[in-house]
């Protein structure tokens, strides 16, 4: 039978304490979990821009556009619920304004007094009884022995975002490195990125109180979760990614992919806008980091990080209020007069190649050419908003296309494309959303578009159509709207024509379903789901008992007093790291030297109990004569100070191997990168070098077939290891060897120091045998699992990794010397 049949599933999975959807949890409901009632939002920017007057040293603050959902979520919690909110964000680039001269790149010099005045100025943003507390992050921050906080030009200050915007952002949107500038500057940009993330993490740790929830958001702060975890191990950390996440083929192009993925996995919960993005992230963790994964989790050192899609939304009540005020009605009346008897298509995009404005214009041009009956009856209002990072070539190509379309189809009284290059005031924006007969979103790659959701709300009972790129996360939310491929101009032209002539009943049906989706998946429901996800992780952590870490000092204090000592240690993953090629997992000189020292001490008995075959152990450890060796999970044993190997499986029936070999060969043939290892008493199918997802899938099928055809006829068991399946006799396991070793000691002369260490499920048999022996003093016996203290194991102690195990062995060996 499979050893998995012996372990109840509840040992490895926790049921959710709280439903993932539903009303917002009250902090009072979570009091028993130690929740403080405060949520620390971590965003790239504070919600306002700032500048300082060079002469008066007075600050000027103005609202920052963008990140609407995050700011709305935070303000809703602060003003309408019992949660307290704190926002940690960068001040952004701070320009100096001079009354004497205009210098767009003047040096900004700030000291501690300027910072104090800044805090006094932004306190006005905190008006109200329960508003959000703002905590600024200053970059580069004070230098040692100096009160200077900033002494840089605007362009120098903008460097903190260079890595995020020039390397990460293009790649997560499926765009490869665009220029040699990235190659030349990547290393320096990365150093700035790391420094910025450290500054954020330091500020968060400075204000953190036990029981706070921390929610870090977006790619500018990928490193922050692990940096916080390094300082506050029990912090409850969520990370939400508001953009696409690419497939592993693209993600592997990240020059710092391992550091980024491991850092994000410092969070307890990772959220994405779309299920496909979550799956891509999980797949990347498997393919790049070689981690164990599940449907909605990634296992990092025994800690299961939850990875799920939570659909982000908008603040619907706010949009309804904003779009229904008097000033919007006045603007709408003006638009109705200006575009009387005309169909209006609206486009609103950042000036960025990812938003597909040139493709949109070409599609509109193709539409007017293909369907001449629509000429003089439809206009495209394209609003293009400049971004912090300028794109002069893109803007030039857009202007040329607009000019070409207007020259080809325009007349004295008809201009087909109206191009607006500025951010609209709210009244103008909502009036356009209300007036437009269609919204045209043509993004090459985009997450959830707030524009589309706000349009649906503004079109209540007006039945305008959303033309939506299939490459946006919004397409999974608005199921019934026409989806377009930005690169297929003919199809886009046809969809535009069909949308403008769609019968009223069909438009009503689409509007009804879209409105239902938008009003169901709101900013409030998104916030509630985030908090529930963090509460579930916290509840699971409280249910689990963390395994205490064995320190070198504690091990040495017991070791130094013992007259008899026993070491029983696994090899792979315990004394050496797990690697893709098992043949590369060779012992270090430091390990061999320390094993030799410990084995030479007459007070010690040292055993390596491994799944490796005899030949491997002979090759690397045969020279250490005082070392006991057990190969193939206990099938073969060489006692300390002996050269003879004993075959404990000599009398066992091995006829099952022929059937297992046939099954393993079948799966090797269909799984590229897999291989068979035939030992004398066991057979192992390795798939570590195979595609991770295909290998895991084939392993499940292979295991099921072995259960049916082999385990039903022979006394064997299947062991699933790290990227391998092993079949072995049921009577042979590591626990049996531990039992034999302990029984070799007289009743009244057991070791007063026992160190038993292993990293995977096969080693749980060793711990089980140790625990069953009632003669052992539990205070001086250490059953140690290698990995996270959150790992599911029956071990009494944990050590983080093989390097730390070797360090402890070195300390004990030094005492022996």
UniProtKB/Swiss-Prot annotation:
Alphabetical GO biological process terms: trehalose biosynthetic process; trehalose metabolic process
Statement: the UniProt record of this protein carries the keyword Cell membrane: no
This protein's record includes keyword Transcription: no
One Gene Ontology MF term: trehalose-phosphatase activity
Cofactor requirements of the protein: Mg(2+)
Entry's Gene Ontology cellular component terms: alpha,alpha-trehalose-phosphate synthase complex (UDP-forming)
Catalyzed reactions: alpha,alpha-trehalose 6-phosphate + H2O = alpha,alpha-trehalose + phosphate
Region (Glycosyltransferase): 1-547
Gene3D superfamilies, per database record: Glycogen Phosphorylase B, HAD superfamily/HAD-like, Trehalose-6-phosphate phosphatase related protein, domain 2
Pathway: Carbohydrate biosynthesis
Entry EC number(s): 3.1.3.12
InterPro entries, per database record: Glyco_trans_20 (IPR001830), HAD-like_sf (IPR036412), HAD-SF_hydro_IIB (IPR006379), HAD_sf (IPR023214), Trehalose_PPase (IPR003337)
Disruption phenotype: Increases cellular trehalose-6-phosphate level during thermal stress.
Keywords per UniProt: Hydrolase
Entry's induction text: Induced by thermal stress, and osmotic stress (at protein level). Induced by oxidative stress.
Subunit and partners: Component of the trehalose synthase complex that contains at least tps1, ntp1, and tpp1. Interacts with tps1. Interacts with ntp1.
Role: Phosphatase catalytic subunit of the trehalose synthase complex that catalyzes the production of trehalose from glucose-6-phosphate and UDP-alpha-D-glucose in a two step process. The disaccharide trehalose serves as a storage carbohydrate that is mobilized during nutrient stress and spore germination. Together with ntp1, regulates the level of trehalose as a protectant for cell integrity during thermal, osmotic, and oxidative stress.
Family, similarity comment: In the N-terminal section; belongs to the glycosyltransferase 20 family. In the C-terminal section; belongs to the trehalose phosphatase family.
Database matches in PANTHER family: TREHALOSE-6-PHOSPHATE SYNTHASE, TREHALOSE-PHOSPHATASE
Protein name listed in UniProt: Trehalose-phosphatase
Taxonomic source organism: Schizosaccharomyces pombe (strain 972 / ATCC 24843) (Fission yeast)
Name of the encoding gene: tpp1
């Amino acid at each position: 039978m499979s050893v998995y049949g012996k372990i109840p599933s509840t040992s490895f999975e926790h049921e959710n304490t709280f439903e993932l959807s539903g009303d917002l949890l009250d902090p009072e409901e979570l009091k028993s979990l130690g929740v403080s009632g405060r949520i620390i939002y971590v965003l790239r920017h504070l919600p306002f821009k700032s500048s300082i007057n060079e002469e008066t040293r007075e600050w000027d603050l103005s609202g920052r556009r963008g990140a609407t959902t995050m700011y709305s979520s935070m303000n809703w919690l602060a003003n309408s619920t019992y949660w307290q909110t704190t926002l940690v964000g960068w001040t952004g680039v701070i320009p100096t304004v001079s009354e004497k001269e205009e210098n767009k790149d003047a040096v900004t010099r700030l000291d501690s007094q300027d910072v104090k005045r800044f805090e006094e100025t932004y306190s006005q943003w905190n008006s109200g009884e329960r508003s959000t507390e703002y905590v600024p992050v200053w970059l580069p921050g004070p230098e040692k022995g100096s009160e200077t906080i900033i002494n840089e030009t605007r362009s120098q200050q903008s460097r903190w975002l260079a890595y995020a915007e020039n390397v990460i952002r293009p790649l997560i949107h499926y765009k490869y490195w665009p220029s040699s500038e990235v190659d030349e500057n990547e290393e320096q940009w990365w150093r700035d990125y790391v420094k910025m993330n450290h500054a954020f993490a330091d500020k968060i740790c400075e204000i953190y109180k036990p029981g706070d929830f921390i929610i870090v958001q977006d790619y500018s702060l990928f490193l922050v979760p692990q940096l916080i975890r390094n300082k506050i191990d029990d912090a409850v950390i969520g990370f939400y990614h508001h953009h696409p996440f690419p497939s592993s083929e693209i993600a592997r192009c990240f020059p710092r992919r391992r550091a980024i993925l491991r850092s994000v996995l410092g969070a307890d919960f990772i959220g994405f806008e779309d299920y496909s993005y979550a799956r891509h992230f999980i797949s990347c963790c498997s393919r790049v980091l070689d981690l164990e994964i599940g449907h909605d989790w990634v296992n990092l050192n025994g800690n299961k990080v939850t990875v799920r899609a939570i659909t982000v939304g908008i603040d619907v009540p706010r949009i309804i209020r904003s779009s229904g005020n008097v000033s919007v009605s006045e603007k709408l009346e003006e638009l109705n007069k200006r575009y009387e008897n005309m169909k209006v298509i609206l486009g609103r995009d950042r000036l960025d190649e990812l938003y597909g404005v040139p493709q949109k214009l070409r599609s509109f041009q193709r539409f007017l050419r293909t369907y001449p009956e629509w000429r003089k009856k439809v206009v495209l209002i394209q609003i293009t908003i400049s971004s912090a990072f300028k794109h002069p070539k893109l803007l030039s190509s857009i202007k040329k296309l607009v000019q070409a379309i207007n020259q080809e189809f325009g007349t004295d009284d008809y201009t087909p494309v109206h191009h607006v290059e500025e951010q609209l005031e709210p009244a103008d924006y909502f009036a356009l959303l209300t007036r437009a007969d269609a919204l045209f979103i043509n993004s090459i790659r985009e997450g959830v578009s707030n524009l589309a959701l706000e349009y649906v709300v503004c079109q209540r009972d007006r039945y305008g159509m959303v033309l939506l790129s299939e490459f946006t996360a919004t397409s999974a939310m608005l199921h019934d709207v026409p989806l377009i491929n930005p690169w297929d101009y003919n199809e886009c032209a046809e969809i535009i024509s069909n949308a403008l002539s769609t019968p009223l009943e069909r438009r009503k049906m689409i509007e009804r379903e879209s409105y239902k989706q938008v009003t169901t998946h709101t900013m409030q429901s998104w916030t509630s789901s985030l908090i529930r996800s963090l509460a579930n992780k916290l509840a699971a952590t409280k249910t689990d008992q963390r395994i205490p870490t064995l320190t070198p000092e504690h091990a040495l204090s017991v070791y130094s007093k013992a007259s008899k000592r026993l070491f029983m240690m696994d090899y792979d993953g315990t004394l050496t790291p797990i690697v893709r090629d098992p043949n590369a997992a060779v012992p270090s000189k430091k390990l061999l030297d320390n094993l030799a020292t410990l084995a030479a001490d007459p007070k010690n008995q040292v055993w390596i109990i491994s799944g490796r075959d005899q030949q491997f152990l002979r090759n690397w450890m045969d020279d250490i004569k005082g070392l006991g060796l057990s190969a193939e999970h206990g099938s073969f044993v060489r006692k300390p100070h002996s050269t003879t190997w004993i075959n404990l499986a000599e009398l066992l029936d091995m006829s099952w191997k022929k059937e297992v070999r046939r099954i393993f060969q079948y799966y090797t043939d269909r799984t590229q990168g897999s291989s068979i290892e035939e030992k004398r008493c066991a057979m192992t199918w390795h798939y570590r070098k195979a595609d991770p997802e295909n290998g895991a899938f084939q392993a499940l099928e292979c295991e099921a077939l072995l259960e049916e055809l082999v385990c039903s006829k022979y006394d064997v068991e299947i062991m699933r290891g790290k990227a391998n399946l092993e079949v072995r006799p049921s009577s042979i396991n590591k626990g049996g060897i531990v039992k034999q070793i302990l029984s070799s000691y007289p009743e009244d002369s057991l070791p007063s120091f026992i160190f038993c260490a292993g990293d995977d499920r096969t080693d749980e048999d060793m711990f089980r045998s140790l625990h069953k022996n009632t003669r052992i003093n539990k205070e001086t016996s250490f059953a140690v699992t290698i990995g996270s203290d959150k790992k599911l194991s029956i071990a009494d102690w944990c050590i983080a990794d093989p390097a730390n195990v070797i360090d402890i062995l070195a300390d004990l060996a030094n005492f022996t010397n």
